[in-house]
């Protein structure tokens, strides 16, 4: 339909957004802000509507919708109009809808710019907002006397916040939490501008009529997850997950070494090959009481920490098997 063509042609989902995607895909020669400027220049060519024009276009759209329903057999015909005349009304309604949408695309940009820290590019927010604008035009009832911009802002904002909730986070937050988080961050920014410091949770809560506990909870829920594979040292050898204790799991030391009676431990380790035995003794400080890290053991043996970890894992499994075969008492 013509209206859908407008949303594709004149919104960020259309030619301008397609161009933006193409530019980014081919090296990003033009910054997003330049593309937004190009888009604004394009949509600024369509004049804004006054209230009378909004009513006129709404009436034309309504007539076109009714005519389409008659043509489709969904509405009982109460008119002597021919199919050609009904089709003319449908076409006029689509043109009116196109004009209505084009004339309000700047409103979408204004709303989208309220979400600078959403995690999504501005052009993507505009794209989602344009879908909300189309919905607003379709649902607008001029008889209720509402100003269209006020009515449409709600639909645009809803489309944008839902997109943020669905796309911008690894873990999806409910829409109402995304909106609450937005209000909290807006208060934080305004407070920082006025006072030159970040507000305490109690100060944010007082501004929003909430509680400090609620503010803290929302901010905690909104934290981005951290990858367990993230490197935490300059060499990239130690990962964040290596530093976290798994309190629900039995450690290798508990599962193997404490299983064995100390007087028989040397005998079991002696059954391993010389290099593996040396690695196990260094890792758990069996000879001198000082445990070494994977990196330290690796340097001593000229191996990477990952290779040491693999050897250690295999050796512990072998020690378990040897312990079972020799009938060691697990309670020792």
Curated annotation (Swiss-Prot):
Compositional bias segments (type: Polar residues): 10-22
Motif Polymerase core binding per UniProt: ranges: 124-137
UniProt region (Disordered), positions on chain: 1-25
Gene3D superfamilies reported for this sequence: RNA Polymerase Primary Sigma Factor, Winged helix-like DNA-binding domain superfamily/Winged helix DNA-binding domain
PROSITE patterns: SIGMA70_1, SIGMA70_2
GO terms of biological process kind: DNA-templated transcription initiation
Cleaved signal peptide residues: none
InterPro entries: RNA_pol_sigma-70_dom (IPR014284), RNA_pol_sigma70 (IPR000943), RNA_pol_sigma70_r1_2 (IPR009042), RNA_pol_sigma70_r2 (IPR007627), RNA_pol_sigma70_r3 (IPR007624), RNA_pol_sigma70_r4 (IPR007630), RNA_pol_sigma_r2 (IPR013325), RNA_pol_sigma_r3/r4-like (IPR013324)
Keyword annotations of the record: DNA-binding, Sigma factor, Transcription, Transcription regulation
MF annotations from Gene Ontology: DNA binding; sigma factor activity
DNA-binding region, residue intervals: 294-313
Role this protein plays: Sigma factors are initiation factors that promote the attachment of RNA polymerase to specific initiation sites and are then released.
PANTHER family, per the entry: RNA POLYMERASE PRINCIPAL SIGMA FACTOR HRDA (PTHR30603:SF59), RNA POLYMERASE SIGMA FACTOR RPO (PTHR30603)
Family stated for the protein in its record: Belongs to the sigma-70 factor family.
Identification of the protein by name: RNA polymerase principal sigma factor HrdD
Organism expressing this protein natively: Streptomyces viridifaciens
């Amino acid at each position: 339909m013509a209206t859908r063509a407008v949303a594709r042609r004149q919104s960020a989902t259309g030619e301008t957004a397609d161009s933006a995607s193409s530019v980014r895909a081919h090296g990003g020669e033009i910054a997003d802000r330049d593309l937004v400027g190009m888009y604004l220049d394009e949509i600024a060519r369509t004049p804004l509507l006054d209230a009378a024009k909004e009513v006129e276009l709404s009436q034309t759209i309504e007539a076109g919708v009714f005519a389409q329903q008659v043509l489709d057999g969904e509405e009982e015909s109460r008119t002597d109009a021919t199919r050609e005349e009904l089709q003319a009304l449908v076409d006029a309604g689509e043109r009116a809808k196109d004009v209505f949408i084009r004339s309000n695309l700047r409103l979408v940009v204004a709303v989208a710019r309220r979400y600078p820290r959403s995690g999504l590019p501005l052009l993507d927010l505009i794209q989602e907002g344009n879908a909300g604008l189309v919905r607003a035009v379709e649902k607008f009832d001029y008889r209720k006397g509402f100003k269209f911009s006020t009515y449409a802002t709600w639909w645009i904002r809803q489309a944008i916040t839902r997109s943020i909730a669905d796309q911008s986070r690894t873990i999806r937050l409910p829409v109402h939490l995304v909106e609450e988080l937005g209000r909290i961050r807006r208060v934080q920014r305004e407070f920082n501008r006025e006072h030159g410091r970040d507000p305490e949770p109690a100060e944010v809560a007082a501004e929003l009529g909430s509680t400090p506990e609620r503010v803290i909870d929302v901010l905690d829920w909104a934290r981005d997850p951290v990858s367990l594979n993230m490197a935490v040292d300059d060499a990239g050898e130690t990962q964040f997950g290596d530093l976290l204790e798994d309190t629900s799991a039995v450690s290798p030391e508990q599962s193997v070494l404490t299983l064995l009676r100390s007087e028989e431990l040397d005998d079991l380790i002696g059954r391993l090959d010389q290099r593996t035995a040396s690695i196990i003794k260094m890792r758990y400080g069996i000879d001198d009481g000082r445990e070494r890290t994977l990196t330290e053991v690796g340097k001593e043996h000229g191996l990477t920490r990952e290779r040491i970890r693999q050897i250690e894992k295999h050796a512990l499994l072998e020690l378990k098997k040897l312990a079972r075969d020799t009938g060691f008492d697990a309670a020792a």
